[in-house]
Amino acid sequence: PRPAHVVAWRAVLPADAPAQPTVRVWDPFVRIFHWSLVGLFTVAFATGDESERLHLAAGYAIAGLVLLRLVWGFVGSKHARFNDFVRSPGKVRTFMALAMRFRAPRVLGHNPAGGMMILALLAMLIGISATGFMMTTDPFWGAEWVEELHEALVYASLWLIVVHIAGVVFSSIEHGENLVKA
C-alpha cells in the first residue's frame, strides 16, 4: 500500500477544494536553456552520420548553451545557482534512500539527486563538445579513439537522460505535482 502522505497521480479533488498555488521555480533562462538543449541534442543525435554541417552547428550551439549555463550557475536566480542544488554524495544517497520509500522531502528547485544529475549531464555535454571539437582539429583529425569517446559519451548521456526523465516522473508522482511545469 502507498504511504498516506503520497498523493495519487490521478487524485480527484472535491469541487470546493482550495486551489493549490502555482509556484514557478525556473526562471526564463533555465526554461529556454533546457528546451533548447533538448531540441539541439535531438538534432545533433539525429544528424551525426547524415549532415555534418547541421551536426556541427547543433554541437557548437550546445557548447555555447552549456557555457552560458555554467555562468548562470554562479550569477543566475536562486534555484539556478549551483550552491542551491549541489549536495554531497552522502546527502544524495540519503535522499535516494528516502525516495525509494516514498519519503523524500519536497524540494523547491533541484532535489539532491536532480542536482547530481545536472552535474553529470553538464560534464557529459562538456566532454561531447570537447571531443566533437577535437575531431575538427589537425592533431585529432581521423583519430579513432576521439570519435569512439565522443560516441560513448553521447550514449552515456542518452542513458542519463532516460534516468533524468524517470526521476522527474517518479518525483512528480511522489509529490503529486507536475515538475515539468514548475
Region locations from a protein language model:
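Membrane-embedded alpha-helical bundles that constitute the cytochrome b-like, heme-associated redox core
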Residues: 1-182
